[in-house]
């Protein structure tokens, strides 16, 4: 049995489900299948868009257990995205109804033959909108590249933000 940390994001409304805040819980429910168990999921947070998109994101994270290897789970995640109306083309930062990413897994690092599958996820250490919900459900999971756990990676963002907001004395 493998454990996976899944990043969940949305910044485009669905014609039936509604706003990104409503899409996230539906996406968590969609992850629960015969061969995938959702152990935990975070609260939904709001984040600013990356790139030129103007829509704010709703983000969350989930821990799932499955016998599936990373490529098979990624294919399943892409199927769920498609079911929600995601079209995979163009820029990675463009608006999307649903984005599901494998962030970490219990098997350590994974570098498959396909460039879209690399574990840990390349953006894991540099994106607070990924780390904040991840820290809610998997604070002690270690990033195999840096050796730091999710809580430590996430706290680096909070510390930097606090420093930036302090008054400047000359």
Where are these regions (language model features)?
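Short, charge-patterned binding micro-sites
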Residues: 40-66
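Short, well-structured hydrophobic secondary-structure segments
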Residues: 32, 63-69, 73
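Small-molecule pocket liners
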Residues: 4, 60, 127-128
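A general structural signal for well-ordered alpha-helical packing
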Residues: 24, 28, 59, 74-77
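N-terminal beta1-alpha1 ligand-phosphate binding loop
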Residues: 1-36, 42-46
